[in-house]
Amino acid sequence: MSIKNIRAREIFDSRGNPTVEVDLYTCKGLFRAAVPSGASTGIYEALELRDNDKTRYLGKGVGRAVKYVNEFLGPALCTQNLNVVEQEKIDKLMIEMDGTENKSKFGANALLGVSLAVCKAGAAEKGVPLYRHIADLAGNPEVILPVPAFNVINGGSHAGNKLAMQEFMILPVGADSFKEAMRIGAEVYHNLKNVIKEKYGKDATNVGDEGGFAPNILENKEALELLKTAINKAGYPDKIVIGMDVAASEFYRDGKYDLDFKSPDDPSRYISPDKLAELYMSFVKNYPVVSIEDPFDQDHWEAWTKFTAASGIQVVGDDLTVTNPKRIAKAVEEKACNCLLLKVNQIGTVTESLEACKLAQSNGWGVMVSHRSGETEDTFIADLVVGLCTGQIKTGAPCRSERLAKYNQLLRIEEELGSKARFAGKNFRKPVFN
């Protein structure tokens, strides 16, 4: 089934910034995809093309990316008579047309919008759910429901508080199903709201970009204490573990780290990577912290390797690896981390995302599928995580519709699978099939 027409437009993401949406038409109908964008972006990510016209959307318009889809990528794909099930062929053609290392000609946001829409159309052409089509593309005979990592306390670049570390997450690994994991997560979230309100007042329960609370606390340990209290109040101390996304590149300063980076600069308070690693180890010792993402700067390889060897927990590469096979290969060689954060817009096509996932998994790593802080109502990543069998997803708190859109889609998938549904649970790092 060939492509009849492709049209792109500017729409808005959850932060009110323009982003790219693509409509792809085949004789089976219309297939629509929207592209997310991040706030704390790694310097090695594929280029998200913005207009940089300060008179329009403060320079954040995506008119050029839309134009490239409508005038170049779309017409080229329509005239090639390609079948939408040929995901790799279509993605490789777009990559060749762009011709740059980081997709800077057309923009990763232009390519990704088309790539996602093609994938949705491919599933319809085969008459299968999107997650099954993705599983086929990845060579997975089985599918698995992930453990959700709910980002319930926000700091860093995602919130206006003093907290340096960006995300404090709860993972209901003790649940028996995705549906139960959602219930546990929602109950802890509401308990946390009450705990924060009692301690810091009602305005402390305002939410950040990803639906988590952003109380004005400075000590990262205090965020963990709040989580511990809420988990106990909800009655789930044996069913929940904690994950963190430190996003340390955001407060990296000349080989050291500034845990009060939102205050006026003061080099005397910077701490060494060893001191920061000690702080992480104290978290692991005193709280059920089992996963830490981006504990150090994206180029601080030595600190990563040392910490991964010593910590014994899941160490997730995001800014370090940027879903890029070259960066992943280097991280494997350096033993810098043991889990990949998979963000489709960091690399720009479905095919390359699948390649990155397979590379990580073949080297014994875990993989966590992720949203971005600037999201849309698109639910592609819910099907992606099921099809790729990664066992873990982070797509915000159980709050804000652009976050719940993904979680609700996972509930539907679990229901559709019925007795065949398998939930990763405690095996979230390396899901197993019985």
From Swiss-Prot:
<dbReference type="Pfam" id="PF03952">
    <property type="entry name" value="Enolase_N"/>
</dbReference>
<feature type="binding site">
    <location>
        <position position="318"/>
    </location>
    <ligand>
        <name>substrate</name>
    </ligand>
</feature>
<comment type="pathway">
    <text>Carbohydrate degradation; glycolysis; pyruvate from D-glyceraldehyde 3-phosphate: step 4/5.</text>
</comment>
<feature type="binding site">
    <location>
        <position position="394"/>
    </location>
    <ligand>
        <name>substrate</name>
    </ligand>
</feature>
<dbReference type="InterPro" id="IPR000941">
    <property type="entry name" value="Enolase"/>
</dbReference>
<dbReference type="InterPro" id="IPR029017">
    <property type="entry name" value="Enolase-like_N"/>
</dbReference>
<dbReference type="GO" id="GO:0004634">
    <property type="term" value="F:phosphopyruvate hydratase activity"/>
</dbReference>
<dbReference type="Pfam" id="PF00113">
    <property type="entry name" value="Enolase_C"/>
</dbReference>
<dbReference type="InterPro" id="IPR036849">
    <property type="entry name" value="Enolase-like_C_sf"/>
</dbReference>
<dbReference type="GO" id="GO:0006096">
    <property type="term" value="P:glycolytic process"/>
</dbReference>
<feature type="active site" description="Proton acceptor">
    <location>
        <position position="343"/>
    </location>
</feature>
<dbReference type="InterPro" id="IPR020811">
    <property type="entry name" value="Enolase_N"/>
</dbReference>
<comment type="similarity">
    <text>Belongs to the enolase family.</text>
</comment>
<feature type="active site" description="Proton donor">
    <location>
        <position position="210"/>
    </location>
</feature>
<feature type="binding site">
    <location>
        <position position="40"/>
    </location>
    <ligand>
        <name>Mg(2+) 1</name>
    </ligand>
</feature>
<feature type="binding site">
    <location>
        <position position="158"/>
    </location>
    <ligand>
        <name>substrate</name>
    </ligand>
</feature>
<comment type="subunit">
    <text>Homodimer.</text>
</comment>
<feature type="binding site">
    <location>
        <begin position="370"/>
        <end position="373"/>
    </location>
    <ligand>
        <name>substrate</name>
    </ligand>
</feature>
<dbReference type="InterPro" id="IPR020810">
    <property type="entry name" value="Enolase_C"/>
</dbReference>
<dbReference type="InterPro" id="IPR020809">
    <property type="entry name" value="Enolase_CS"/>
</dbReference>
<feature type="binding site">
    <location>
        <position position="293"/>
    </location>
    <ligand>
        <name>Mg(2+) 2</name>
    </ligand>
</feature>
<keyword id="KW-0460">Magnesium</keyword>
<keyword id="KW-0963">Cytoplasm</keyword>
<feature type="binding site">
    <location>
        <position position="167"/>
    </location>
    <ligand>
        <name>substrate</name>
    </ligand>
</feature>
<dbReference type="GO" id="GO:0000287">
    <property type="term" value="F:magnesium ion binding"/>
</dbReference>
<feature type="binding site">
    <location>
        <position position="293"/>
    </location>
    <ligand>
        <name>substrate</name>
    </ligand>
</feature>
<protein>
    <recommendedName>
        <fullName>Alpha-enolase</fullName>
        <ecNumber>4.2.1.11</ecNumber>
    </recommendedName>
</protein>
<keyword id="KW-0456">Lyase</keyword>
<feature type="binding site">
    <location>
        <position position="318"/>
    </location>
    <ligand>
        <name>Mg(2+) 2</name>
    </ligand>
</feature>
<dbReference type="GO" id="GO:0000015">
    <property type="term" value="C:phosphopyruvate hydratase complex"/>
</dbReference>
<feature type="binding site">
    <location>
        <position position="245"/>
    </location>
    <ligand>
        <name>Mg(2+) 2</name>
    </ligand>
</feature>
<keyword id="KW-0324">Glycolysis</keyword>
<keyword id="KW-0479">Metal-binding</keyword>
